Amino acid sequence: MATATEQWVLVEMVQALYEAPAYHLILEGILILWIIRLLFSKTYKLQERSDLTVKEKEELIEEWQPEPLVPPVPKDHPALNYNIVSGPPSHKTVVNGKECINFASFNFLGLLDNPRVKAAALASLKKYGVGTCGPRGFYGTFDVHLDLEDRLAKFMKTEEAIIYSYGFATIASAIPAYSKRGDIVFVDRAACFAIQKGLQASRSDIKLFKHNDMADLERLLKEQEIEDQKNPRKARVTRRFIVVEGLYMNTGTICPLPELVKLKYKYKARIFLEESLSFGVLGEHGRGVTEHYGINIDDIDLISANMENALASIGGFCCGRSFVIDHQRLSGQGYCFSASLPPLLAAAAIEALNIMEENPGIFAVLKEKCGQIHKALQGISGLKVVGESLSPAFHLQLEESTGSREQDVRLLQEIVDQCMNRSIALTQARYLEKEEKCLPPPSIRVVVTVEQTEEELERAASTIKEVAQAVLL
């Protein structure tokens, strides 16, 4: 039946072709040939090219205006007005030929120029040389790396630790090692730039909550819980992370960790804790914000910190359960594809840990000095102190902005410069303004170390007050 129908249709088509007018057939034939020509012909011919005359060439050359190799830079750009630091950035440092008390460098425990740390680094240099010439998985693992990881794990009372050769890359590599596309990350709006880069690399769904606002975080968690109920199948494969800092780099405030742990278990999320400022600072033994609050470290899924603030070294580490850390050895980009930490810096970090364990009273001394200068800087007309009294790095911001960020920066820089002239070394907090998700207001960052005496702290506070009054009033 189907064959007969097809034959009948074919007969009808042939009959219609015979009955069609001649002009109709000619037009369709021309169109078919034109389509074939368009399909197989080139859009241009190499031979069809007209050469410019000498006069036309000269006119084009005269009209051409080359772009500058380097864009114009204003004379007040920070890159053109730099300070020259001579010697190590220890308790006192020489800036532009003048000895200053250093309130700018992250050297909380004063170990940068510690003789024991220097001796350990020198001995390692003589034994191993300078570098390792490869990543950890490609002949870049030395025994001193394994010793440092073991010491860090024991110090933090975790199962295992992993070290990175660059502090910034530690949390920036750890986050995308676990959080992938489709996962959800709840992160504080004041998170540091390293966390932001890690989130960007993860390509996860990012939800920002107000700084240290647990009510706002719970609101977001509840909203996500409602979304999960609409699609249970998707929810089963979607992981939820909460990323916070122990002490926030951009605000100097401490995270409310006990409340975060409660929300973690209530809404089945994982906590990543960045402790670059709180490690070696908070807690009776310097173990960070978990020890400060008395929280079981197993309640935190991953702890990250750099070794550049308290340990007088370079690099960073992550610690936690063994299965969490082992995953980074194959998935942590900064671990797999960067040359490993130079052995001399690993040896320096081990010796710094020895000093911390032998002298736990150093943390109480640091806390006392932080409180002293924090109190002394209160009540400065035109400036406000931003940060906790126990934080060794806090900010001085303008009480009222001028309405222009550039003008605010200039005012604060004038304060910094005049303090420098009076032998107090300070610095502004610097940001990549176009890259920051939530750009903090301009500020002067003040960093405290255990080596600063009470007299030096009082002198710094009085100098800042006098200079601020002269500049702002």
From Swiss-Prot:
Phosphorylation at Tyr-164 inhibits activity and promotes cell survival. GO terms for cellular component: endoplasmic reticulum; endoplasmic reticulum membrane; serine palmitoyltransferase complex. The chain crosses the membrane at residues 16-36. It is an enzyme of class 2 (transferase). Changing G387A: Does not affect catalytic activity towards serine; does not affect the interaction with SPTLC2. Pfam families: Aminotran_1_2. This is Serine palmitoyltransferase 1. The lineage of its organism: Eukaryota, Metazoa, Chordata, Craniata, Vertebrata.
